[in-house]
Amino acid sequence: VDPEQAYDWWAADYDSQPDNLMLALDEQVFGSLLQEMSLAGKQVIDVGCGTGRHWNHLLSGHPASITGYDVSEGMLKKLQEKFPGQHTVKLNDHRLEATASASADLLISTLTVAHISNIKETLQEWDRVVKPGGHIIITDYHPNALARGGRRTFKHNTETVAITNNVHPVPDVIAMAGQLGWQLLRLEERNIDDTVKHFYEKQQALSLFEAFKGTPIIYGLLLVKNNAAQ
């Protein structure tokens, strides 16, 4: 199912998933990367913001503003219920039309990149809106797991729905970022190992755990835009 439809369906229950492995690991990875910087007075863009999973964390840093972009009206409605009056924009393609060039101090995109087919054009658009010296944080379902048949799924009306994903190898994403003049500051990866086994036990999916054990399941990148001279 395409991401727009899938996340419209998922929106009602998205914030009620205490046993969701990816969301738990994303909290760890994103939090680790975000602690590298101060948000005070900064302009922040969240691409694929969903229901605003990270917005309590972001707002606690007192940024000047956050703009959330997402393809799903359902997810944006949930975000507005949680954070009334915050600036959100429905995405129709890769263009961040509500954001001026070289205006963002920080652009984040969590658990979203694999949903993007035109990744090169998307990164170019992100480059347009980020200031020279600004930062980019990306986290996502690890492409190694997707390439091995891993799927992003959820329950909808008792049916299991799988969301369309694209495999963008991490070295390719880093290389494309480098071509834009972005410098990689940190790479974080988490593997499926015994520390996450209990998630699979709760889902009665130990066979899946054994099949994917040792496989990277999530990655995170912290980058800085160093292309002022370009």
Q: How would you describe each model-predicted region?
A:
Residues K120-P132:
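A short glycine-rich, Lys/Arg-flanked "PGG" loop and its adjoining helix->strand segment in the class I
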Residues L106-N118:
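A short SAM/SAH-binding and catalytic strip from SAM-dependent methyltransferases
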Residues L185-Q230:
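Conserved Class I S-adenosyl-L-methionine
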